[in-house]
């Protein structure tokens, strides 16, 4: 089973690919897709999808796992995040991947044992749980690894 974990965002989206071989988890790759707020939204969404499409074609995941989002007090921010999620879900559908969504507290609890963990705690734990992740310093990238990890260890596939 290969899972593409996605921490959805418009400005700094984290992605990660983690595989489960027998009972072992194996980190394959991860990264961050950054877009500029100066660019028009449709160009930003297209860029995000073009990078994620390359990841899908290279690693051939069976499933995508994405963080559920909450409604922000800033409605414009929430709407833009909704655009990003919709574009990502459309790409996931185009490649006929199964998809799971996880609440932020579920991800935090699965990775750290505490549902209200801070970003640095998640980063620390993924480095302990998955060999190969030591070079990760970006919290969006770490969150994407945590999302893929959560999908695999909760057997939510």
Swiss-Prot record:
Keywords: Cytoplasm, DNA damage, DNA recombination, DNA repair, DNA-binding, Endonuclease, Hydrolase, Magnesium, Metal-binding, Nuclease. One of its GO terms (biological process) is DNA repair. It catalyses: Endonucleolytic cleavage at a junction such as a reciprocal single-stranded crossover between two homologous DNA duplexes (Holliday junction). Mg(2+) 2 binds at residue 67. The active site is at residues 7, 67, 140. Disulfide bonds: none annotated. GO terms for molecular function: crossover junction DNA endonuclease activity; DNA binding; magnesium ion binding. PROSITE patterns: RUVC. Its EC number is 3.1.21.10. It is found in: Cytoplasm. It is an enzyme of class 3 (hydrolase). InterPro entries: RNaseH-like_sf, RNaseH_sf, X-over_junc_endoDNase_Mg_BS, X-over_junc_endoDNase_RuvC. The keyword Nuclease applies. Coiled coil: none annotated. Pfam families: RuvC. Mg(2+) 1 binds at residues 7, 140. Binds 2 Mg(2+) ion per subunit. Belongs to the RuvC family. The RuvA-RuvB-RuvC complex processes Holliday junction (HJ) DNA during genetic recombination and DNA repair. Endonuclease that resolves HJ intermediates. Cleaves cruciform DNA by making single-stranded nicks across the HJ at symmetrical positions within the homologous arms, yielding a 5'-phosphate and a 3'-hydroxyl group; requires a central core of homology in the junction. The consensus cleavage sequence is 5'-(A/T)TT(C/G)-3'. Cleavage occurs on the 3'-side of the TT dinucleotide at the point of strand exchange. PANTHER family: CROSSOVER JUNCTION ENDODEOXYRIBONUCLEASE RUVC. NCBIfam families: ruvC (TIGR00228). Homodimer which binds Holliday junction (HJ) DNA. The HJ becomes 2-fold symmetrical on binding to RuvC with unstacked arms; it has a different conformation from HJ DNA in complex with RuvA. In the full resolvosome a probable DNA-RuvA(4)-RuvB(12)-RuvC(2) complex forms which resolves the HJ. This is Crossover junction endodeoxyribonuclease RuvC. It comes from Rickettsia bellii (strain RML369-C). The lineage of its organism: Bacteria, Pseudomonadati, Pseudomonadota, Alphaproteobacteria, Rickettsiales.
